Amino acid sequence: MLAASQALAAGIDLSKPYGDKYGCINRNGQQVAADKMLLLTDKELITAASACTFDDKQVQADGSLVVTAKCEAEGEEGHAPAKFTIKRSAKNAKKLVVADEGGNVMGEVARCK
């Protein structure tokens, strides 16, 4: 267990929320309507169209996180399973990149101020 917590300490810390501009504005509830929004916390990933609750987080050898989640899409019933990869941005080490299971980048997020 110690190795996992050390990897997490050196890797990605989600104890504070990360988001794009609108994700951070809306982190405490819907403040502004936005077509594009990304908010990442230690428990969920929220976009303009869906909300995903994390079931499991696995730290990878490269320091990235692979997250399995249940997602609820706007206007749809029930939850769908999903997998995301969260890793540090190659351009800016303070930012994180969120990609879906297919490797499509959903967006880049920075720690909310």
Task: Please give the residue ranges for each predicted region.
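Short, exposed beta-strand-loop hairpins at the edges of beta-sheets
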Residues: 85-109
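Processing junctions and N-termini across compartments
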Residues: 3, 17-18, 46, 65, ...
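Sequence contexts marking disulfide-bonded cysteines in secreted/extracellular proteins
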Residues: 23-27, 51-53, 70-72, 111-113
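Short, flexible beta-strand-to-coil junctions
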Residues: 21-22, 70-73, 99-104
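Sec/Tat signal peptide C-region and signal peptidase I cleavage site
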Residues: 3-11
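Short, hydrophobic/aromatic-rich segments at coil-to-beta transitions
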Residues: 15-17, 43, 62-68, 92-97
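Short, solvent-exposed loop/hinge segments that bridge or flank secondary-structure elements
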Residues: 12-14, 19-47, 78-79
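Contiguous, well-ordered beta-strand patches that form the walls/edges
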Residues: 47-91
